[in-house]
């Protein structure tokens, strides 16, 4: 009757030698060459320690209903008109103060609990002899992230447009984008910039000067800007019609750059190290088998006796 192999298992063979023998020294050297070189290879290949990472997040943005407007007029109209939601600023304007009609609406288009855009409309009443040639506008927002990095800050959108011909309406459609000069820290709440962009309680004109406001704002490591506003300047205003600013500002998903924490860095480094280590383990395992089987270093081979046979020997 023909016989077939139905089951097999390897027989364990051990090799014995003294702790001060060449075999022990070889094993120590093999262990060092197995575990240390993968660490050096992973480190020298760059990117071993994860110093910067990124992720996507929809920020929580809310319009603060703080506005500062400067409307630039033609030379025959007296320079400019101004208005803001800050009473101290308005008191400084004198005859140049002109109170507009403002309407705003924020919209959550995907119903995720976070606002997605702002609809802003401003109607500035003008006299028949006044003609607007340019606009400078600041809108302020509260801006917060919640996942890896958790900054909370007061930010702004600055719009500036000027044209050679008088206009009746300025239409703007852009994104409120996050700008980072360095990665955000993921170690707890960061409220360094949770202060008003404009010091609305100051009685000094210097604190409302746009040059000063923009310069101080740009000193921050994290800011927001109105990106791609695509201004459309409409002409042909009736004598008694106001100058209108229509703005749609979107709050898009942002790619956030941040400094990873300690355990994230260790996890990233560990994955790189282990992927190289497995190759070295496989290679040196084959080398050790060759060295001990062929007695390149002197040892005493011992074949392990199966447990069943050991019991039989004791019984006999």
UniProtKB/Swiss-Prot annotation:
Major place of residence: membrane
Family recorded in the similarity comment: Belongs to the TMEM231 family.
Name of the featured protein: Transmembrane protein 231
Keywords from the named record: Cell membrane, Cell projection, Cilium, Cilium biogenesis/degradation, Glycoprotein, Membrane, Transmembrane, Transmembrane helix
Name of the encoding gene: TMEM231
Lineage start: Eukaryota, Metazoa, Chordata, Craniata, Vertebrata
Location of this chain's protein in the cell: Cell projection, Cilium membrane
InterPro entries registered for this protein in UniProt: TMEM231
Keyword Translocase attributed: no
């Amino acid at each position: 009757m023909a016989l077939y192999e139905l089951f097999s298992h390897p027989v364990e063979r051990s090799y014995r030698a003294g702790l001060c023998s060449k075999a022990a020294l070889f094993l120590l050297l093999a262990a060092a060459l197995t575990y240390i070189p993968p660490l050096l290879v992973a480190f020298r290949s760059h990117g071993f320690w994860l110093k910067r990472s990124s992720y996507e997040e929809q920020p929580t943005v809310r319009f603060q209903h703080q506005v500062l407007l400067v409307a630039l007029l033609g030379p025959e109209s007296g320079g400019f008109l101004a208005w803001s939601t800050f009473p101290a600023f308005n008191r400084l304007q004198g005859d140049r103060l002109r109170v507009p009609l403002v309407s705003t609406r924020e919209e959550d288009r995907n119903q995720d609990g976070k606002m997605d855009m702002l609809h802003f409309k401003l109607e500035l009443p003008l006299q028949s002899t006044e003609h607007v040639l340019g606009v400078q506008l600041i809108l302020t927002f509260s801006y917060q992230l919640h996942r890896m990095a958790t900054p909370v800050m007061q930010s702004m959108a600055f719009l500036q447009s000027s044209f050679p011909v008088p206009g009746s309406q300025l239409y703007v459609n852009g994104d409120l984008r996050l700008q980072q000069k360095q990665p955000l820290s993921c170690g707890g709440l960061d409220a360094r910039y949770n202060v008003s962009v404009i010091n609305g309680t100051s009685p000094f004109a210097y604190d409302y000067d746009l040059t000063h406001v923009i310069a101080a704002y740009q000193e921050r490591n994290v800011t927001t800007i109105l990106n791609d506003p695509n201004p459309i300047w409409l002409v042909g205003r009736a004598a008694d019609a106001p100058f209108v600013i229509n703005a749609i500002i979107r709050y898009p998903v942002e790619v956030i750059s941040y400094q990873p924490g300690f355990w994230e860095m260790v996890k990233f480094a560990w994955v790189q190290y282990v992927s190289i280590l497995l190759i070295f383990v496989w290679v040196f395992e084959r080398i050790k088998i060759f060295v001990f089987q062929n007695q390149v270093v002197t040892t005493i081979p011992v074949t392990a006796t199966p447990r069943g046979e050991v019991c039989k020997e004791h019984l006999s």
